[in-house]
Structures are given as C-alpha cells and as structure tokens.
A protein has these predicted regions:
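Juxta-kinase regulatory segment immediately upstream of eukaryotic protein kinase catalytic domains
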Residues: 1-32, 36
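ATP-binding pocket architecture of kinase catalytic cores
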Residues: 35-200, 204, 208-214
Length: 215
C-alpha cells in the first residue's frame, strides 16, 4: 500500500535516533526481530507520524513537532492515554504499545502503537481508489456513524476516561487559547483593517459562547 499510505523519506529536520528507539522498544518487551525501517507520513500540522517497520512488527510512532510549542499542546501522554482508554468501549482504535516520557531517548516524548491498515483521506483520493456516487455516500455516512458512536461514549463509564476530562470550560479554553495564539503569531504586515476584523470576530466568539457542560 506504499502508493496509498503516503509514507516517504524522513525529512532531515524531523529525523531521530532510530537505534535509540529500537533499544527502547526492546526494553518495553517488544521483540523487533531485526533492523528497523522508518518512514514519515506527510501532511498534518499537529504531531509528527512515522511508520516503523521491523521483521516482526508494523508500528506507528507519534511525536511532537520540533521548535517552539504552545503551552499544553502536543501532549503525548494524554493522546496515548485517551486512545488506550477508548479501546474497550469504542474498539476502532489501534493497540497502544508503549509511551516514552523520557526526552533523553530522541529529544522529546513519543509513543508507539500498532499500525492499522487503511486509507489516509487527503484532498485528492489516490488513483487506485475509484468510488462511484453510491460508494462516496456510503463512505461519508459511515464516517458520520462512527463519529456518532464515538461521541455517545460516556466518559463517566470508565475510570480511565473520566480521569482524562478537565470538567467544564472547554469552549472558553478554545476561544481564549486560539485568540491568544493568533495575537502572538500575527506579524506587523497584517494590516490594521485585518486586525480590526479579526478582533471583531474574536470578541463575538467570546460573547456568544454556548452554555457550558462537563466534558
């Protein structure tokens, strides 16, 4: 599936010590059985995703991007624990292998999970995927059905899930966080009119937040 999966050579700026990861996997009890082949998935703007293949395992490694990061963003431990907790009630989650919170291994936290084969949706579907109108409809309604299943899971039904919630305040945190990030990222050439329009939108969002509920 190499022409569909989109994994290619690891970008120089995103490379890491493969042997260090191999040694760490062995320490976690994963018998990798030989040399490790690492490739990087393109796209995405959050965390970096790699294919890690050995003679005995087909794995995925996730790590934060390099450079300056927003406070609280790219939390590998939280991402790992959410997926691990969803495995039993939801099912459509990869098996988690192990979480590394020791920056000394590759310079950042990371985690490894089993690979689940499938298509990574992008702006253009690959030529090998030829869907007629009926198939596209089934694909879209199927995706919606899965999202509905996911959002019907009660976080209080599992001790692992309930421990991950931050209670109320999700919308407020999002509005305040993204407004702050926008203000910090904008440059002098943005222009006064564009800044004023942006501030108007942010003020509207701040004033029209929906009623809060625990999440």
């Amino acid at each position: 599936m190499s022409d569909i999966e989109g994994a290619g050579e690891v970008r120089d700026e995103d490379a890491f010590d493969v042997e260090a990861v191999a040694a760490w996997l062995r320490e976690q009890g994963t018998d990798i059985g030989g040399p490790v082949d690492v490739r990087q998935f393109g796209g995405g703007a959050s965390n970096l995703t790699y294919s890690v293949r050995t003679p005995t395992h087909d794995l995925i490694l996730r790590r934060p991007p390099t450079g300056k990061k927003a406070r609280g963003a790219h939390d590998m431990g939280r991402e790992y624990r959410i997926q691990a907790a969803l495995k039993e009630p939801f099912g459509l989650v990869a098996d988690m292998v192990a979480l590394c919170q020791d920056d000394a291994v590759i310079g950042s936290e990371f985690y490894v999970m089993q690979r689940v084969d499938g298509l990574i949706p992008r702006r253009e579907l690959p030529p090998a995927v030829d869907l007629d109108e009926a198939a596209v409809r089934r694909l879209c309604t199927g995706a919606l059905d899965v999202l509905i299943r996911l959002h019907r899971i009660d976080p209080g039904s599992s001790a692992d899930l309930s421990a991950l919630g931050k209670g109320t305040g999700y919308v407020r945190r999002q509005v305040e966080g993204w407004s702050t990030r926008f203000r910090n990222a904008r440059t002098e050439d943005v222009g006064r009119q564009r800044i004023e329009r942006s501030e108007t939108v942010m003020a509207w969002l701040d004033a029209h937040q929906p009623d809060d509920v625990a999440n």
